């Protein structure tokens, strides 16, 4: 089920009234669902834009149409308007299932490590233009990683590995015993913090 707050409903109703198109609603869909790049898209939908297989959610003064192929990914989503900086208001969509479900305990150690790296660690590293790839996961639970982008050659890579990545993997993935760096940091072209410049 999708929850849309009264504040968000009022916001959309006012926007739709301004458009003045009879029967206009709002369509919600998942973009790249089940991947780390997954996102939710909201857009106006005129009656002629609809395919007919959308799920309809009756709201105050309009209908929210959920793309049929997106329903499973958007189950449990919450749409709201929250206070932003400097007194502004910001539309938020929280869709806890949109990036997929974490592999269960029955999944292999390799699958669980890959999921955490792709869905939790790499999105954080991307803010610095970096990424990390899993090179190997040994039978003993040792994870061998290779840094890339702004993390390759970065003077803070050791700190990121020990205080960020290793801590996250060992805390979130039972069976991980250690995390090691297999990166050739000397060949990094655009490190976030060049080696020797780290504090």
Curated annotation (Swiss-Prot):
Q: MF terms per GO, please?
A: 4 iron, 4 sulfur cluster binding; iron ion binding
List ligand-binding residues for [4Fe-4S] cluster: 151, 154
Keyword annotations for this protein? 4Fe-4S, Iron, Iron-sulfur, Metal-binding
Cystine pairings recorded for this chain = none
Per the annotation, how and in what number is the cofactor bound?
Binds 1 [4Fe-4S] cluster per subunit. The cluster is presumably bound at the interface of two monomers.
- GO BP term (any one): protein maturation
Q: Does the keyword Magnesium apply?
A: no
Entry superkingdom: Bacteria
Note the InterPro entries from the entry: Fe/S_biogenesis_protein_NfuA, FSCA_dom_sf, HesB-like_dom_sf, NIF_FeS_clus_asmbl_NifU_C
Cofactor(s) of this protein: [4Fe-4S] cluster
Q: Which Pfam families match?
A: NifU
| PANTHER family associated with the record | FE_S BIOGENESIS PROTEIN NFUA, IRON-SULFUR CLUSTER SCAFFOLD PROTEIN NFU-RELATED
Family statement drawn from the similarity comment of this UniProt entry: Belongs to the NfuA family.
HAMAP family recorded = Fe_S_biogen_NfuA
Listed name of the protein = Fe/S biogenesis protein NfuA
Organism, by scientific name, is Stenotrophomonas maltophilia (strain K279a)
Gene responsible for this protein: nfuA
């Amino acid at each position: 089920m999708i929850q849309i707050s009264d504040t968000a409903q009022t916001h959309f109703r006012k926007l739709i009234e301004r458009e003045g198109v009879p029967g206009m609603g709002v369509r919600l869909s998942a973009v790249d669902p089940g991947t780390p790049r997954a996102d939710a898209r909201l857009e106006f939908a005129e009656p002629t834009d609809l395919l007919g297989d959308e799920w309809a959610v009756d709201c105050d003064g309009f209908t929210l149409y959920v793309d049929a192929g997106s329903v499973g990914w958007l189950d449990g989503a919450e749409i709201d308007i929250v206070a932003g900086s400097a007194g502004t208001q910001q539309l938020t969509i929280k869709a806890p299932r949109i990036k997929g479900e974490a592999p269960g305990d029955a999944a292999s150690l390799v699958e669980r490590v890959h999921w955490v790296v792709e869905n939790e660690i790499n999105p954080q590293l991307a803010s610095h233009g970096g990424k990390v790839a899993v090179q190997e996961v040994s039978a003993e639970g040792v994870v061998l990683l290779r840094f890339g982008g702004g993390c390759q050659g970065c003077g803070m890579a050791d700190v990121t590995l020990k205080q960020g990545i290793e801590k996250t993997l060992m805390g979130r993935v039972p069976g991980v015993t250690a995390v090691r760096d297999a990166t050739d940091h000397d060949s990094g072209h655009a490190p976030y913090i060049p080696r020797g410049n780290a504090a």
